[in-house]
Amino acid sequence: MRSFLYMLSQRPKLACLCGKSIIIWPGKRTNLPENAFTQRMLQECGQMAKPDASVDLDNFKAISEQSPAEFGIDSCRVKAQPEDRSDRIREQIASAYPVIHERTLLLFISFLEHKLTFGSEQEKAIYKDMTVVDLVQRLLAKRCVWFFGANDYYRTMQGNIGNEGFEAVGTPAEKEPLTLTSVLSYDEIKLSALLYVSCHSEFINNGSRVNGGEVLQNKDTIEREGVVIGLIGARFERPDVMEYQDIMITKTQNTEANGYGFDLEQISSETVTPASDLRRIWREFYEEPRDFIYADTPYDTTRFEEVSQGIFDHQVMRKRYAISFDTLLLEAQDRAFKAGKPAYIHVVGIGLGVWKAARQQERTFLESFEGRLRALGERLSHIGVVHFSWFHLACVGSLHDGAIIPVDKHPQGGIRIRNSVRNPGDKLTEDMLPVVTYAWDGNALPGNEFWANMLISTGDPAAACSTLISELQNPHINVHYMNGANLHIASVEHGLLHVGDYARRLIV
């Protein structure tokens, strides 16, 4: 059961950033296991092919009309767009897919193996014979319509509305309507937070937080279309679940009974427990040799910060960000390369709003982003500008408005940095591909609060009101493209590949 992610990982390298030693992670290669379960999972991935279904726009609209989730407005739907945009919209529909980091693919495999061995009866029944592609499809399709707030206010796809109860999903204590057959468990939502969605889309307006779906008649002040990527930050609103398990160190959570405090060498087949094995797969995902009992946490102010709940681990937070940033940068690079023009990436602070849990979290975000820009280097030949919008810190490391991050062989010598307030759809002054990000959620459809008719609230509904993502990135509407079989993998070594192409490169 000992995972390849730890055993075969390369020794982490260090870089100096802001006077601190920052681990360069992940490395350029993710080594693969040779165990039979992983090889079988990759073999099954290798059988997948890109969808070749042609886009029938009338059928797409008909499926949307049957959606069990009600649209608050129609201006952001395909049916409301001008007829002369139909050909472009067909291309945008076909451009949609889910995307994960290559390390996340291997994490999903470890998760399935763990649950088949240590899962509850409910979990074993669900995961029996499940492939990675099946798991991704489940993470897309079984999420709620909306899911937000510290009390987990939700509406399921079946129309049930309520608060709380997700901690029991997948256990003998689960109750209708929150059962594993209908919704995701918190262990799955944690995985789902590493699963992102991407597509080209129309821009209806400038995408401001208060756009409310207004149809801008004068298109001269906005970009007509661009790439829209839903990223998900670390969520700390509920204790003892999600990234809280990996990044928060508390008296009640970080105990041996909950699987914490063990070195890998301490655990054997005789001493392993479901809790310690679940901690193992996450430690190995982040390539951390151990996680900490609260009382044994080392004194290291460059890594740890005291917060109201306990201790916040910035090293693991930085790694969590790195997975998101690698995926964003490699996805934007591929989209821009295919478009034949440099990408202008609009970056928002995922997890830095109501989910923010530490004073230094924004600094860690920006440090991690700079680290990944430098680490990916020559892979980012088609990244022209990275624009940080609505950040409080004007300068962290080399990231400040007007900076250039040097990149060998880059057509412009490097990647330009902007740090100022702008709207995602604002007109660019150069011929570049707009790539805009929005802060999504691991247990909601794209738009989240949008579906609760809260159109003017956060970046999630703002993105849904200003683009076509509520349909194009919706697995219940864009059924031929936004599905597990169309999963794409962002690889530091190989670039952006369909899961079938990626797996065929790796199969032993």
From Swiss-Prot:
This is ADP-ribosylarginine hydrolase CG3568. Keywords: Hydrolase. The keyword Hydrolase applies. Its EC number is 3.2.2.19. ADP-D-ribose binds at residues 209, 349, 351, 353-355, 390, 441, 448-449, 459-460. One of its GO terms (molecular function) is ADP-ribosylarginine hydrolase activity. The keyword Nucleus does not apply. It comes from Drosophila melanogaster (Fruit fly). Protein ADP-ribosyl hydrolase that specifically removes mono-ADP-ribosyl modifications from protein arginine residues. It catalyses: N(omega)-(ADP-D-ribosyl)-L-arginyl-[protein] + H2O = ADP-D-ribose + L-arginyl-[protein]; N(omega)-(ADP-D-ribosyl)-L-arginine + H2O = ADP-D-ribose + L-arginine.
